[in-house]
Amino acid sequence: MSEKKEIATFAGGCFWCMVKPFDEQPGIEKVVSGYTGGHTENPTYEEVCSETTGHREAVQITFQPDIYPYEKLVELFWQQIDPTDAGGQFADRGSSYRAAIYYHNDEQKQIAEASKKQLEESGIFKKPIVTDILKAEPFYEAEGYHQHFYKKNPDHYGRYRVGSGRQGFLDEHWRDR
């Protein structure tokens, strides 16, 4: 078996909720919370939350495509977000919480665009799919206390995932699929 590794980057609102779903899959080497898409080098959490850096909260995933292909990562990404929300995700509002797929090569771009089209045509959502598909930009790792938040603070993570409205939305749209 090949040890080929690739990188995938997804912005899906608060990065706390974006790590666990990917972390649990086979062939995923690591999932890092961070910031991408902005104009400030090495931004802090406070700077990103101030909406002045242009960054989005995101996760960067190192994966083995022979075990867990990029197509499956994109499919799992869609199942973690509200792709019809251009103003943020769930309780988190603002440009730093907007969803996006950041592609690292032409193949990823084509897969992401085809997947978005398929989702649009599926009828799962009544509103248009507005999630951006963008060329990957520099990714800056978030502060240590944000990394694997679901493991370090399981109770807080669980309350946040439900209280933000994320879990209810995902259950409503994906439970039976």
From Swiss-Prot:
The active site is at C14. It catalyses: L-methionyl-[protein] + [thioredoxin]-disulfide + H2O = L-methionyl-(S)-S-oxide-[protein] + [thioredoxin]-dithiol; [thioredoxin]-disulfide + L-methionine + H2O = L-methionine (S)-S-oxide + [thioredoxin]-dithiol. Keywords: Oxidoreductase. GO terms for molecular function: L-methionine:thioredoxin-disulfide S-oxidoreductase activity; peptide-methionine (S)-S-oxide reductase activity. It holds the Pfam family PMSR. One of its GO terms (biological process) is protein modification process. It comes from the Bacteria. Its EC number is 1.8.4.11. InterPro entries: Met_Sox_Rdtase_MsrA_dom, Met_Sox_Rdtase_MsrA_sf. Has an important function as a repair enzyme for proteins that have been inactivated by oxidation. Catalyzes the reversible oxidation-reduction of methionine sulfoxide in proteins to methionine. Belongs to the MsrA Met sulfoxide reductase family. NCBIfam families: msrA. This is Peptide methionine sulfoxide reductase MsrA. It comes from Bacillus velezensis (strain DSM 23117 / BGSC 10A6 / LMG 26770 / FZB42). The gene is msrA.
